């Protein structure tokens, strides 16, 4: 049975960060298994909050956090041969405080390594859509990458491209940046490692998704490093929050395809008289229900997991 969680409440676990969707807690050593107490770990909780245009909307999508967590875990396991990830395998229930309803958290939270975040959003695009399409219409480029003339909306790119952005605070907008700016922000060696990992994972995931009847139009990754400089993929992976998923049988060049992601909510919000700043508008129940159905469909079609 899916649960609903808008805000985490975990007495005894210090709240480290409250993001648009995820709440991140430090885990005191006394709550960790004895053989892991030499390390530093976090509890990351995927709530049912929904953000659009970098604004957290007031209405939760019931069960969304559980769906996101299960999709992420599926992809983390599927891609661990390509790139190490932040998961530890430590049982979530074992680190939760006593006296709470642990069933609210066990399917929507993970225990992870504590890493130093790379200060960019790592985006891979295989199709020309969204802000990439807008950039192309204006300049013929996306994040400084020159593309062929005459491409249409939603058209497949000759090759997937790496188009990073800044990591804005909650309520502020991410900004697309070119690779030279990325190098200035994080250094040449790390920028190249992040770019290579982003495109490597995208190629693998796009091929797998296509075999499931889904096009992976674009996706966003976050990376972090440990004290030895080893690079990990972290946060979430290939979820409907961080990716555009299109059903293959409804894909058509020249128009924005229907999707299994929150683009559906963005499209609804575009019809409103809203300036894309907080507070966000209330969502009708029909939009909430249809959004949940899209996320559920993505989980079932990609991972073969039925959830209700």
UniProtKB/Swiss-Prot annotation:
Any GO MF annotation of the entry: phosphoribosylaminoimidazolesuccinocarboxamide synthase activity
Gene Ontology terms: biological process = 'de novo' IMP biosynthetic process
Q: Keywords of this protein's UniProt record, alphabetized?
A: ATP-binding, Ligase, Nucleotide-binding, Purine biosynthesis
CC annotations in GO: cytoplasm
Q: What class of enzyme is it?
A: ligase
Q: What is its EC number?
A: 6.3.2.6
**Entry-linked Gene3D superfamilies:** ATP-grasp fold, B domain, Phosphorylase Kinase, domain 1
InterPro entries in the record, alphabetically? Answer: SAICAR_synt/ADE2_N (IPR028923), SAICAR_synth (IPR001636), SAICAR_synthetase_CS (IPR018236)
The record's section on Pfam families has:
SAICAR_synt
Catalysed reaction per UniProt?
5-amino-1-(5-phospho-D-ribosyl)imidazole-4-carboxylate + L-aspartate + ATP = (2S)-2-[5-amino-1-(5-phospho-beta-D-ribosyl)imidazole-4-carboxamido]succinate + ADP + phosphate + 2 H(+)
- Pathway connected to this protein: Purine metabolism; IMP biosynthesis via de novo pathway; 5-amino-1-(5-phospho-D-ribosyl)imidazole-4-carboxamide from 5-amino-1-(5-phospho-D-ribosyl)imidazole-4-carboxylate: step 1/2
Domain of life where this protein originates: Bacteria
**Similarity field:** Belongs to the SAICAR synthetase family.
What name does UniProt use for this protein? Phosphoribosylaminoimidazole-succinocarboxamide synthase
């Amino acid at each position: 049975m899916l649960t609903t969680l808008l805000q985490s409440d975990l007495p005894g676990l210090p709240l480290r960060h409250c993001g648009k969707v995820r709440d991140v807690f430090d885990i005191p050593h006394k709550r960790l298994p004895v053989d892991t107490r030499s390390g530093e770990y976090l509890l990351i909780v995927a709530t049912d909050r929904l953000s659009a245009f970098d604004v957290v909307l007031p209405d939760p999508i019931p069960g969304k956090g559980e769906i996101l967590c299960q999709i992420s875990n599926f992809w983390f396991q599927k891609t661990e041969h390509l790139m190490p990830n932040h998961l530890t395998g430590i049982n979530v229930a074992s680190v939760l405080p006593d006296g709470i309803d642990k069933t609210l958290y066990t399917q929507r939270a993970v225990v992870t390594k504590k890493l130093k975040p790379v200060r960019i959003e790592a985006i891979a695009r295989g199709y020309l859509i969204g802000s990439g399409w807008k950039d192309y219409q204006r300049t013929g480029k996306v994040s400084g990458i020159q593309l062929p003339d005459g491409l249409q909306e939603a058209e497949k790119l000759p090759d997937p491209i790496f188009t990073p952005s800044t990591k804005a605070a909650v309520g502020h907008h991410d900004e697309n940046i070119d690779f030279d700016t990325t190098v200035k922000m994080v250094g040449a060696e790390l920028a190249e490692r992040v770019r290579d990992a982003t495109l490597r994972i995208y190629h693998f995931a796009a091929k797998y998704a296509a075999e499931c009847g889904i096009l992976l139009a674009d996706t966003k990754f976050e990376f972090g490093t440990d004290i030895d400089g080893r690079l990990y993929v972290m946060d979430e992976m290939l979820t409907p929050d961080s990716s555009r998923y299109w059903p293959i049988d409804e894909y058509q060049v020249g128009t924005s395809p229907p999707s299994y992601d929150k683009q559906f909510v963005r499209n609804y919000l575009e019809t409103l008289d809203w300036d894309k700043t907080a507070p966000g508008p209330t969502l009708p129940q029909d939009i909430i229900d249809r959004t949940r159905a899209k996320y559920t469909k993505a989980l079932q079609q990609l991972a073969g997991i039925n959830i209700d």
